[in-house]
Design a protein with these regions (language model features):
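Conserved C-terminal beta-signal and adjacent last beta-strands/turns
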Residues: 6-9, 18, 359, 371, ...
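Acidic, small-polar-rich N-terminal luminal/periplasmic segments of exported/outer-membrane proteins
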Residues: 44-177, 563
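Outer-membrane beta-barrel translocator/receptor signature
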Residues: 142-145, 156-232, 240-244, 304, ...
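Acidic/polar loop-and-plug regions of large Gram-negative outer-membrane beta-barrel proteins
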Residues: 215-220, 227, 232-239, 243-311, ...
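Structural signature of Gram-negative outer-membrane beta-barrels, strongest in the C-terminal barrel
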Residues: 237-243, 361, 380-392, 453-585, ...
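Surface-exposed extracellular loop regions of Gram-negative outer-membrane beta-barrel proteins
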Residues: 256-267, 393-395, 486, 515-562, ...
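Membrane-embedded beta-barrel scaffold of Gram-negative outer-membrane proteins
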Residues: 309-324, 328-334, 524-525, 554-637
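Gram-negative outer-membrane beta-barrel transporters
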Residues: 473, 579-584, 599-698, 732-733, ...
């Protein structure tokens, strides 16, 4: 077996290299009528709108109408908004979209991307340029043009889906223009970041683009933890000025972090008597406390993704094939604080439990599609049709320790004392020392690769979309997708044959909407969509895994009814949207009264969204939104009426959690970001972000409090091509939590940080 020596992370050194949402508000019909004379939105007008920073249309060819006329809630975070707010990863960018929260610690992703959209876990619903991006990751933004959030059941667009929505990350590609931009930033907490984005025209219709990134920093308001990553993304395009185009690209990113789940245990752990409980909130003796170990904990990730995108425009119809090979790895060993053992309540100490994983995901995906427009009589059609195939292979091991992490004085996880006698597996809850010499008496090694678990997932799909323009006021949007989904989990057994668990399902999903246009610059729509969530949809590297208990079950089915409206106002300077929706899952996987898992549960969510984005004047831009989510676990199955891990037959009773709200779901959330550019070259910006109370568990006993966070930005144009930008995040140094784990802990947000970047364009 291979032995691993955990290294102490070195001090940071300064580095270098370079670095909306089209959602809205209720329509004001009187103002809408004033803008109606603008007429229909032709290509020239669309260019004008995008220059103003108003509507940004989705990149996916499966959207067969402009965003204004698409009967679905879609939020887009533009590259400009990402840069203004100082975002450096996907989680930073998504705070601009209300209705998205983040989960903690599940499925091999302790500190990575686990977004919840409209109350549903969407970790496995992330796409890059329309192809599913498998493998747990913390995604960077240095190679992104925009982030698209499709809300509501989306299986008609992407196949297997959790029911809340999906994310599509749009990569930067070459263009016929010579330009280079670079950004070099420093900041508090040893922050150093550099990015370069260089685009060159190489010949007739040929261009190349190179994006580079290096990032290092500590975590604001946290001891010990730090991040270190770098990335490179080259691409080349042929035929940019003709009907036949070919784009080849590669994305590489790797990180080596001292991970910080930001974990603080809840005040009501199972391991302590109720008389010593505080309440369901996390206990925080000092926000800076880091309960991990510098000489033990690590997280190392790597992503290599190669893409070939070929297309031919026949004139009115376009054939496109995009193929991708992906290889990602995520190796980590990190400290989970106390694991509900109750040591902080009982003794004022904490047990340093470890979580580890060594996972590799290899994937191939190919999508062949045809898009275009045609007319049948008086009906105008805009269509998209295609087929897809994907093959994903996940292998998963872990890291082991000698000796283990139990307290040698008690032989278990109880920690009446701390220090060397406990092998430093027990720490002082109020004053932990992350530099305890744990490695002096312990070793870490990778588990036997021959015993790695493997999950293989293959999917074959076909889809068709059509937007039918009946007349100037009425449109119909239809979409249909078929998926054949097959996944197998293989678990090796030493000295015996491996065990295998399989799930094979095919499912049909659809999207249907009717759009009424009372004016050329507005729309009112009613839509209906579905999604399917099969067992093992995460491919073995997420929070919805395959097991013998669920292998024979059908997919969970989610349906969504949505009524919404979208408007362009003030000569397309302001875009407003509003939507109300009802989402229900009628066959959720739950335990029934004989102790088995069945598709017998029900949960639903009713919600309301408002949003606005626009360039109100040449100097003033505004972006914001509000989301209301009223969730309920209608039928959460049955639970054992007696304590113990084995329940006698006939002792199951209806779940006491029936009627509770969804975990990781904020009832109210809102955000506002605005900038104003003064004639002297100075631009000032400010943002406010609100999230309501969230529960971590279905019992609604573990929770994190509501919070409001403020950010600020100032930039100054030294010359036309040189500027300085200052960002201050969490301006008031608010102590708050962003992620609530189901049982053990919650993740604290970073404290106040400030960064200053020099941005150059030439």
């Amino acid at each position: 077996m291979t032995h691993i020596t955990s290294r102490k992370h070195a001090p940071r050194v300064s580095l270098l290299a370079t670095a909306t949402l089209a959602a809205g508000f209720a329509p004001l019909v009187a103002q809408a009528a004033d803008s109606a004379d603008a007429g229909s939105r032709n290509a020239t007008e669309l260019d004008k709108v995008q220059v103003r920073g108003s509507w940004f249309n989705p990149s996916s060819p499966k959207f067969t109408a402009e965003l204004l006329d698409t009967p679905k809630s879609v939020s887009i975070v533009s590259e400009k908004l990402i840069a203004e707010t100082g975002a450096t990863n996907l989680q930073d960018a998504l705070r601009m979209v209300p209705g998205i929260t983040f989960g903690a610690g599940e499925g091999g992703n302790p500190t990575g991307d686990r977004p919840f959209i409209r109350g549903f876990d969407s970790q496995s619903n992330v796409f890059v340029d329309g192809l599913r991006d498998v493998g747990s990751q913390t995604r960077e933004i240095f190679d992104l043009e925009q982030v698209e959030v499709v809300k509501g059941p989306s299986s008609a667009y992407g196949g297997r889906d959790s029911g809340g929505g999906s994310l599509n990350l749009v990569s930067k590609t070459p263009k016929l223009k010579n330009e280079t931009s670079a950004s070099m930033g420093i900041g508090t907490d040893s922050y150093a970041r550099g990015t370069v984005d260089a685009n060159y025209v190489l010949g007739d219709g040929i261009a190349a683009r190179l994006n580079l990134m290096k990032h290092e920093s500590d975590i604001a308001g946290r001891d010990a933890a730090n991040v270190s990553r770098w990335g490179i993304a080259p691409s080349i395009a042929f035929g940019l000025n003709g009907p036949a185009q070919l784009i080849a690209s590669h994305y590489h990113m790797q990180s080596d972090d001292l991970p910080d789940a930001g974990g603080f245990p809840y005040g009501n752990p199972n391991g302590a008597p109720a008389s010593k409980w505080v309440d369901g909130r996390p206990m925080v003796p000092d926000r800076n406390n880091y309960y991990g170990l510098v000489d033990r904990d690590f997280q190392r990730t790597r992503a290599d993704i190669s893409t070939l995108d070929a297309s031919y425009d026949f004139g009115g119809h376009k054939l496109r094939n995009i193929a991708r090979l992906g290889n990602t790895s995520n190796d980590y060993l990190w400290t989970q604080p106390d694991d509900s053992q109750g040591n902080p309540n009982n003794y004022g100490t904490l047990w340093r439990r470890t979580n580890s994983r060594a996972v590799d995901v290899k994937s191939f995906a190919d999508q062949l599609g045809l898009t275009g427009a045609f007319q049948t009589g008086a009906l105008k059609h805009s269509y998209s049709a295609g087929v897809e195939y994907s093959d994903e292979k996940m292998t998963r091991g872990s890291y082991l320790m000698t000796p283990g992490t139990s307290n040698p004085l008690t032989g278990n996880s109880k920690c009446p004392t701390t220090g060397a006698a406990t092998g430093y597996n027990c720490a002082d809850f109020a004053n932990p020392n992350p530099r305890d010499p744990w490695a002096a008496t312990h070793s870490v090694y990778r588990s036997d690769k021959a015993l790695d678990v493997e999950q293989r997932t293959k999917t074959t799909s076909a889809y068709v979309f059509d937007t039918i323009e009946l007349n100037e006021q009425w449109m119909v949007n239809l979409g249909l997708r078929y998926d054949d989904f097959r996944t197998t989990l293989t678990t090796p057994v030493a000295g015996a044959a491996p065990t295998r668990v399989r799930n094979s399902n095919d499912f049909l999903n659809y999207q249907a909407g009717v759009v009424f246009k009372p004016a050329a610059n507005g729309s009112i729509y009613l839509s209906w969509g579905t999604s399917s969530t099969p067992p093992g949809m995460d491919g073995g590297d997420g929070s919805d895994g395959l097991s013998a208990a669920v292998a024979d079950l059908k997919p969970q089915d989610t349906k969504n009814l949505e009524l919404g409206t979208k408007w362009d106002l003030l000569d397309n300077r302001l875009n407003l949207t509003a939507a109300i929706f009802h989402t229900v899952m009628n066959n959720a996987r739950v335990t029934i009264d004989n102790g088995t898992s069945q598709n017998a549960g029900k949960k639903e969510i009713n919600g309301f969204e408002l949003g606005f984005t626009g360039q109100l004047t040449d100097a003033w831009s505004l972006y914001g939104g509000y989301t209301y989510l009223d969730s309920e676990l209608k039928d959460n199955g049955f639970v054992c009426a007696v304590s113990g891990r084995t329940c006698p037959s006939g002792i199951y009773v209806p779940s006491p959690n029936n009627g509770n709200v969804f975990p990781n779901t904020a009832k109210h959330s809102a955000n506002l970001w605005t900038t104003y550019r003064f004639p002297i070259g100075l631009t000032l910006g400010a943002g406010a972000f609100y999230s309501d109370k969230q529960y971590g568990d279905v019992a609604n006993t573990k929770w994190i409090a509501s919070y409001t966070r403020f950010d600020a930005m100032a930039s100054y144009a030294i010359q036309d091509n040189i500027s300085l930008q200052l960002n201050v995040q969490n301006l008031t140094d608010k102590t708050y939590f962003t992620k609530a784990y189901a049982s053990h802990y919650a993740s604290i947000a970073p404290g106040r940080s400030a960064t200053l970047a020099l941005n150059v364009k030439f």
